[in-house]
Amino acid sequence: MAGITTLDIENTTAKTETGKLLLDPFTPDNKLVLVCTKQDDGTESSFWFHHTEMETNDTSEAKRLLQEQLDQTTVLVCHNAQHELIWLWDTGFEYTGPIFDTMLVEYLFQRGQKSPLSLEAVAERWELDNQKMGTLKEQLRKGLSVDQIDKDELEKYCLADVRATQELARGLRKKMFSTEYSSLQNIIELTNTLCVLLATIYYRGFSVDKDALRQVKDEFQKERQGLLMSLEKQVYDLVGDTPINLASPEQLSSIVYSRKPHDKSTWVGNFSKYMKKVDFDLAVKNNSSVVYKTTAISCQDCQGKGYNLYVKKDGTVGKAKRICHTCNHTGIVYIPQKKIAGLKFSAPSANWVANHGFSTNKLSLELLESVARRREMSYAEEFLHNIRRLSALDTYLSSFVEGIETYTKPDQKLHVRLAQHRTTTGRLASDSPNLQNMPRGNTFPIKKVFRSRWPSGKIIEADFAQLEFRAAAFLGNDTLAKNEIETGFDVHSYTAEVITNAGQKTTRQEAKAHTFAPLFGATGYGRTQAEASYYKQFTSKYEGIASWHKDLADEVMATGKVTTPTGRQFAFPDAKRRPQGGITHFTAVKNYPVQSLSTDIVQLTLLLVENNMRKAYLQSVIVNSVHDSIVIDTYPEEEERVKETINNAEQQLREVFLQKFEVDFDVPLVLDFKSGINWMNVV
């Protein structure tokens, strides 16, 4: 028995307090129940490890036989291999060979057109026999644990999954070699190879300092309480006695823009994103009202009680209470004053229209805060800053603090699952919690809760410098961009200079938000006039990138897709030419190649660094990857050797890229690295 083995496992699961399933082996009550395999010669096997119907707890023979199969396996086929691998490893099995993940390969074949990737959904699309049996579904709905489901029924289901996965793998391999999809072969190999490393990172975990986490939580909560007190006073100054819930986008909109729609149900329909400014302003005026500050008085109709007692026909007062509609049961009436409430901002265009009024999202408030700063509207600037900070703190507490508290396992590690199939471009995603959403840089306090697993160890973070810009310079073969990269030209200072010269004083730090935005399809639309001048100048400055953007549009119209140098494909089946010559979906058409090429570089580097560290017999381990960075838990006294390993990977990248994709990436790639006692204090 040897060759390709298709494998599926069944395990028990637990739930968090919020009802989210915990599928991993690091949760104490979770158990491996059953492993089913199928060989290419048709041989099927079932290995039981835990079930309420088992007559013995001795699983040594099952372990021996399964390990024999794994030892003779040349390729392990799974649907969602990370899950299978960590369960095998945690149960004591060894497998370090190649894998073929049918879920990931199907994801790549979707070419950015997302469809569900569960085995059941994929099997249905491929018309394979893999429907969960009715009795099994019913037992799961009743709340039975996997190890309580009828043993024969569970085995039938697991074997059905294995058969479907094997058949799916054969279909996917055949598709790989078709003319239409052949460009994906190299990226499929990279994706499957990386999957094993990401499972390893998941299994290793990232050590969490619980004391530091409590300290950060206390600091966030204290700051939040102070903000709420400040905002309570600011809201009173802005709107008077009107009760305001700042968590309501509708009420926040009325404060920021000092207007309220007449009818929310028809509000959005009054606007078109292509309407002229004069028509937009008129539509706002005709369909919304100015909001005024109010003074609260006791309702005269109910004497401030919020209700009236029922008066009988004979004039006597009954016990029944009737809601006072004058005050809406509050006992208070709010009398409008002559002073307009709120900050009195005007939305610049129909793009700012929202269901509740006008946009109050993060970007909109950030832009308005910038406007307030330039106009020296200090009160508005402070209010908007406080609102944005309050929103950020709420996110930090709910997503990061609570997430880390919930998902840190008994081994005091957060096991970071990096998913390859969640984003359109292949960029890694994570959840439980989503560490990819952490603010960039080394000032975010949450990062200091992540430490080395060794008492004197350090955390090293290696980060690519301006990776997306370098990818775009290569893709557009832009001479000027390449020259700026090679000479170390300060592009952020240049951006600040352009915007400042256009009449809006801008710091280098503020300019960073704009420098590379055009690479991802952003335009000057919705920006200030001075900021828009930079976006216009970007196109004329980087002629190679601009020309490449035009070529992409032509490619999409000719073939319905974009193919990157690494072979990734992105389909745009419904792309159309616009009357003015552009195409629909142009933002995505420009964005996907840059982001996906950057992603492939990072993923190739992850494998290089890991392989180099293993060849050097280092104990240090990769524990995370966020955006364009690699995070390494560094064993004491190995810091310099790890840095040397990173330098070696940087030097090898061009040659490895050429060997892997037959593409000469002729733009220098730079990995900057920092180290510290925790993830935040890396310098």
Positions of the model-derived regions?
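Active-site-proximal helix-loop-helix substrate-binding element of RNase H-like nuclease domains
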Residues: 28-33, 37-177, 495-500, 506
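Conserved "right-hand" nucleotidyltransferase catalytic core of DNA-directed polymerases
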Residues: 1-10, 15-17, 27-30, 34-41, ...
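Function-dense linear segments that define catalytic or interfacial modules
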Residues: 417-502
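Short hydrophobic beta-strand that contains or immediately precedes a catalytic carboxylate
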Residues: 6-8, 99-100, 246, 459-463, ...
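Short active-site loop/helix that positions an aromatic residue
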Residues: 13, 82-93, 105-110, 252-261, ...
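Polymerase palm active-site segment centered on the conserved acidic dipeptide of motif C
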Residues: 213-250, 538-548, 637-683
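Catalytic palm subdomain of template-directed nucleic-acid polymerases
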Residues: 108-112, 166, 200-224, 472, ...
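Conserved catalytic core of nucleic-acid polymerases
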Residues: 196, 203, 301-324, 330-333, ...
